[in-house]
């Protein structure tokens, strides 16, 4: 696969016109050249601090204070987590992972307040 456009590369995301060569999902080359595309090519994102175990409460709490939303034991998040069964929790986590993948996040680091169960 060839990806052409402006490539943002290196730690400083230096813009370089050219193409990226990908074979079998592996980056093979970054080539500087005149690109026939206005696309922007950049490295995938890494979310270094997630709580996908709380995904069931992701859209909840508009208009609440932080304390009303997350304070244990009766903040809205904690109530929603207690009320949800395992299947609902897993489905919500799967949706969060799918969203991250679809929006360019290649990996994430998960923090679990309640353990891994």
Outline where the language-model segments fall.
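Conserved, mostly hydrophobic/aromatic
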Residues: 38, 49, 104
């Amino acid at each position: 696969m060839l990806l052409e456009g402006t490539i943002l590369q290196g730690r400083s995301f230096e813009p370089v016109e050219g193409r990226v060569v990908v074979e079998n999902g592996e980056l093979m080359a970054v080539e500087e050249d005149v690109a026939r595309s206005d696309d922007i090519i950049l490295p995938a994102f890494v979310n270094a601090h997630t709580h996908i175990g709380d995904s069931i409460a992701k859209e909840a709490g508009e208009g609440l204070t932080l304390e009303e939303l997350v304070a244990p034991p009766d903040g809205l998040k904690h109530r929603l987590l207690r009320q949800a069964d395992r299947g609902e929790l897993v489905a919500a986590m799967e949706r969060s992972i799918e969203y991250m993948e679809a929006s360019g996040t290649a990996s994430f680091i998960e923090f679990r307040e309640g353990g891994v169960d």
